């Protein structure tokens, strides 16, 4: 790969990192072509972009964005790496867990950046999967706001039935 090609890839990765709220780092080494194709198809269906990138180019892209990536330098940026980009924090984690349920251990979660916070290690995958999306939070808030109104309406409805029965 020439320096010009590397510079283009670094620029692309930097733009994707800057434009996405979340990126995950995975290890897909040892996956068969069929497994990779199935994983990419699943990513596409969930709106997640998956791209295999050399660690040195990921580091340079992060440096270009002035992001302190020292938390990722350990296990996350060693070995083969694939990047997953998403605007919803929990979607890549849920996607990885769903793919693993099919009996495939790879791609393996190595680390993630969620709203500029780093999560490194396999043990963080469950926590990331449990993060609620914006839509889920809005739904919870609406349900909480509707509950008192529904109680009042229910109470008024019961009162009107009692009044109608007495009349």
UniProtKB/Swiss-Prot annotation:
PROSITE patterns: RIBOSOMAL_L10 (PS01109). GO terms for biological process: translation. Keywords: Ribonucleoprotein, Ribosomal protein, RNA-binding, rRNA-binding. The keyword Ribosomal protein applies. GO terms for cellular component: large ribosomal subunit. InterPro entries: Ribosomal_uL10, Ribosomal_uL10-like_sf, Ribosomal_uL10_bac, Ribosomal_uL10_bac_type, Ribosomal_uL10_CS_bac. It holds the Pfam family Ribosomal_L10. It comes from the Bacteria. One of its GO terms (molecular function) is structural constituent of ribosome. Belongs to the universal ribosomal protein uL10 family. Part of the ribosomal stalk of the 50S ribosomal subunit. The N-terminus interacts with L11 and the large rRNA to form the base of the stalk. The C-terminus forms an elongated spine to which L12 dimers bind in a sequential fashion forming a multimeric L10(L12)X complex. Forms part of the ribosomal stalk, playing a central role in the interaction of the ribosome with GTP-bound translation factors. This is Large ribosomal subunit protein uL10. The gene is rplJ.
